[in-house]
């Protein structure tokens, strides 16, 4: 049972994938957004290639727990993904995932240029990892 993690942004979608047992998360790729149709096709290819059975999407919340300004866009994307793939996405609180990813990359002495290329993939990995940890404890 592989799980796909997505960090959906305006320009890029970070993608992470779990191992077969659903215990660990690894960054997979970054999709540079062009159109909704092409984005969905790209994700569907990944789902089919890796035999994904579950999809987790980072859900943007404010620090007080309310839905963030991008929440409606993410919900709309999730609805379209469900229609396209038949897999109903699970939302996972992505508060501070990008901030945490940035801190990890800075602490690893990764250059700004390289950080820009991988931050979305790392954020997706953190989102998926949080979800997998929660599932393993419940």
Swiss-Prot record:
It comes from the Bacteria. Coiled coil: none annotated. Pfam families: RuvX. GO terms for molecular function: nuclease activity. The keyword Nuclease applies. One of its GO terms (biological process) is rRNA 5'-end processing. One of its GO terms (cellular component) is cytosol. Gene3D superfamilies: YqgF/RNase H-like domain. Its EC number is 3.1.-.-. The keyword Cytoplasm applies. InterPro entries: RNaseH-like_sf, YqgF, YqgF/RNaseH-like_dom, YqgF/RNaseH-like_dom_sf. Its main location: cytoplasm. It is found in: Cytoplasm. Keywords: Cytoplasm, Hydrolase, Nuclease, Ribosome biogenesis. Could be a nuclease involved in processing of the 5'-end of pre-16S rRNA. NCBIfam families: RNAse_H_YqgF. Belongs to the YqgF nuclease family. This is Putative pre-16S rRNA nuclease. It comes from Carboxydothermus hydrogenoformans (strain ATCC BAA-161 / DSM 6008 / Z-2901).
